[in-house]
Amino acid sequence: MAQVVDGPEEFLDRTLSLLGDSSTDEGTLGGERADRAAAAQTRALLRAGRAGRIEVGGDAETCPDRLSVLVHTHATRPRMLVFGAVDFAAALSRAGHFLGYRVAVCDARTVFATPARFPHADEVIVEWPHRYLADTEVDARTAICVLTHDAKFDIPLLRLALSLPVGYVGAMGSRRTHDHRLGAPRELGVSEDELARLCSPIGLDLGARTPEGTAVSITAEIIAHAHQGTGLPLSRGTGPIHRPAPGVLASAARTAA
């Protein structure tokens, strides 16, 4: 729910209801353009399940009057499921926590999957990865990161993960490992469309070598994937830096139709 809390008197207390994909549901802040601008800015807050304050308008393209808008969210934090209690997982759980994810680290090996090793994780689970995934809740905002690098864990886990309506599935390993990793799921009936969802090798090419650098690489890919970013330097692009969210574009198309 977006509510005008500061601006010209005729706009005060106007509200706009937004859905999880940032498309508008009901109400208005003062016009279609202002509504679309607000929806675009609130997408990150909605994904993170956070409240916040945004500024809308003050220009001819959206609304001549500048509006201060308070965004109330009614959603839990998105989940990041990290499989494999390795050093990279410790750095990734810290980065995920920083980005507002509810982080779970899962590994079947009791000696490695301990809260002491992953202080930034909300949950540390000792279980076979595919069994835990089968029993836990996921949604379109969930990011699944497979760092186990072991076929006996990877294959059943990826087979399940790629069939679920999650936002991101990535797996660590070399290109050769990736090629081998695709064979077994195919034999088990995983479709080509499902395999195409797999981000492997995981992360963007940042030249990272350390666990911390690799965590930045992985989370950068997750962010780009969620917001349909290119992952390219902004200095190489043209046009607006902040593009409308996919849900906003869809809403605008429906309105135009």
What is each residue range found by the language model?
Residues 95, 156-161:
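A short acidic, amphipathic alpha-helical/loop segment
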Residues 130-140:
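Short amphipathic alpha-helix with an adjacent loop that forms part of the alpha/beta core around
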Residues 172-257:
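Adenosine-phosphate binding glycine-rich loop
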